[in-house]
Amino acid sequence: MYKKLYLIGILLLGLISGLTFNLIFFTVPYQLSEAKYTTDIIGSISLAAFPYCLKVIWSPFIDKYSIPFLCSKFGHRRGWALVSQIFLILAMTGFLNVSPCNNLYITAIILFIISFCSSTQDIVLDAYRIERPTSKEELSMAFTFSSIGFRLGMLLGSVGALYLSIIFGWNTVYKFALFITVVGPIVILCIKEPKPKEKRHTTTNLIGLQQYFEVIKKSIISLKNEQQYLLLIMLFVFLYKAADSIPMAMSSPLFLDLSFTTHEIAVIYKAYGLLIMIVGGALGGVLAAKMGIFHSVLIGGVIQLLSPLMFMILATIGYDIRIFIITVTVQNFCAGFAGTIISIYFASLCNSEFVATQYSIIASFSSLSRIILASLGGICAKYLTWPVFFLGNTLFSMLFIPIFYKIYRKKLDFVNISKKI
């Protein structure tokens, strides 16, 4: 039991990650909305989160470059984690001295730095939670704890931030966020450095452009030598995300069209929904540990189809608080359940010394898929009624099933992948 205490550390680091993520995507935009800033300005502030989509660019550097003294003293992963945490704390401290409503440009710059530091921490945490576990059961637990921590952080950064701002003001909200972030370096010092499955070749010399591309090339090749495998996996991930990404992107427009109040959306969808997502994520991790990757991914994908179906039912019935609660429950449970499982699947594909780079490549494609699906969904929703739109969403999402079996029949099966862990 003592050996698995690192899972608590992963949970706490996930919490910090979720808190800083929501700081950019929810807390600051909400404060600016209260100050009556226009949506275009609020939207432009959100561009500060761009590093989250571009982690793959500097993940090879994190895999290859060893920070003098820190990496030799604390280990490669912990050394990088300490650096990202220290700079994150400095950026959060600087943010305390800035009023977002009065200093938009400085706010955007500091948020960009926070985003860069937080996404760097995410790269290291992704690699840590893949390398540290010693069995596939522990791998599932590591991703489950990380998922729970991230969503708890999101809960603190949204509902918790709103209540604190009402009682104490926004400055106290950011002080609270800084206080939580300070826990990060302490956690990193308390957990052990993981032992990589393959020997890690690092350097203290800044890697050149040729070496940089060599790391990316080797990372992609080591995912799988057969190109067809990679293409099928990419198509599978794209279709798998459709049942979650489209309903999530279209949820607010649908709820407002059906005349649900802001209070109902905040309490039921934001607060209650996040708690249900945590439960779903935990159960998804347990299922993956018990049944393995192959069956878990299939079950998660099928259950996820209930999400757009419930949105279709809600859109057909109209305003009904009971159906609304059921829809939110189903959608968030499915998002947490399938989200944890697909993350574990991503981790199972990473099997070389370039774990951080490999996971960043896969996760970046997943994020890109979510953005594309949300954008396409918005265009389609403009020309269709809500019930027809979500019925189409359900049918489109079902296409992942034949792709899944296409992969299995070509011996690109998830069972063999899970045995590599």
From Swiss-Prot:
InterPro entries: AmpG_permease/AT-1 (IPR004752), MFS (IPR011701), MFS_dom (IPR020846), MFS_trans_sf (IPR036259). It is a multi-pass membrane protein. The chain crosses the membrane at residues 6-26, 41-61, 79-99, 104-124, 142-162, 166-186, 230-250, 274-294, 297-317, 323-343, 361-381, 384-404. The keyword Transmembrane helix applies. Disulfide bonds: none annotated. It is found in: Cell inner membrane. It comes from the Bacteria. Keywords: Cell inner membrane, Cell membrane, Membrane, Transmembrane, Transmembrane helix, Transport. SUPFAM superfamilies: MFS general substrate transporter. GO terms for molecular function: transmembrane transporter activity. The keyword Transmembrane applies. Gene3D superfamilies: MFS general substrate transporter like domains (1.20.1250.20). One of its GO terms (cellular component) is plasma membrane. Its main location: membrane. Belongs to the major facilitator superfamily. This is Putative transporter AmpG 3. It comes from Rickettsia felis (strain ATCC VR-1525 / URRWXCal2) (Rickettsia azadi).
